Amino acid sequence: MKGCSLDLHLSPMASTLQSCHQDSTVNDRSSTIRSKEINAFYSGRLSEYDLVEIQMRAIIEMASKDREVTALELVPVRLESPLGCSVKRSVKRFLEKRKKRSKSFTLTPNYTSSTSSSSSSLHNF
């Protein structure tokens, strides 16, 4: 493939139709590389291009690599949630305080003797 340019000179077909057509007929005579029309929808615009097969393959390869990079960028990275850590810390603190309160809780002397007899009499009714 001597003399075959792999440079991707893309321009809309309407503006360079005549020059591309002349280039493709020269290529048809000198080698087996043929020019084909391709419609490209990219960034919300539809364009027509007159390309040789090698250029189309290069475009497809570049687009697939671009898509792979984009897909990798969109993969969510799961990190330890800061919310989960703070919730764990909060629960731990709550349980420690509750344990301290339960240990420090003592019954008063007035409450134990007088209420036990009155509460038992209430249950007899």
From Swiss-Prot:
Keyword flag Membrane: no
Domain of life: Eukaryota
UniProt motif EAR: location: 6-10
Gene Ontology process terms (BP): defense response; jasmonic acid mediated signaling pathway
GO molecular function: transcription corepressor activity
Keyword Amino-acid biosynthesis: no
Bias-annotated ranges (Low complexity): 112-125
Gene induction: Up-regulated by mechanical wounding, and methyl jasmonate or coronatine treatments.
Residues covered by region (Disordered): 99-125
Keywords, in A-Z order: Jasmonic acid signaling pathway, Phosphoprotein, Plant defense, Transcription, Transcription regulation
Post-translational modification note: Phosphorylated at multiple serine residues.
Quaternary context: Monomer. Lack of homodimerization, and very weak or no interaction with AFPH2/NINJA and other JAZ proteins. Interacts (via EAR motif) with TPL. Interacts (via jas motif) with MYC2.
Record note on domains: The jas motif (82-103) lacks the canonical degron LPIARR that strongly interacts with COI1 in the presence of JA-Ile in other TIFY/JAZ proteins. Contains 1 EAR motif required for the interaction with TPL.
Role played: Non-TIFY functional repressor of jasmonate (JA)-mediated growth and defense responses. Intrinsically resistant to JA-induced turnover, probably due to the absence of the canonical degron that strongly interacts with COI1 in the presence of JA-Ile in the TIFY/JAZ proteins.
Official protein name in the record: Protein JAZ13
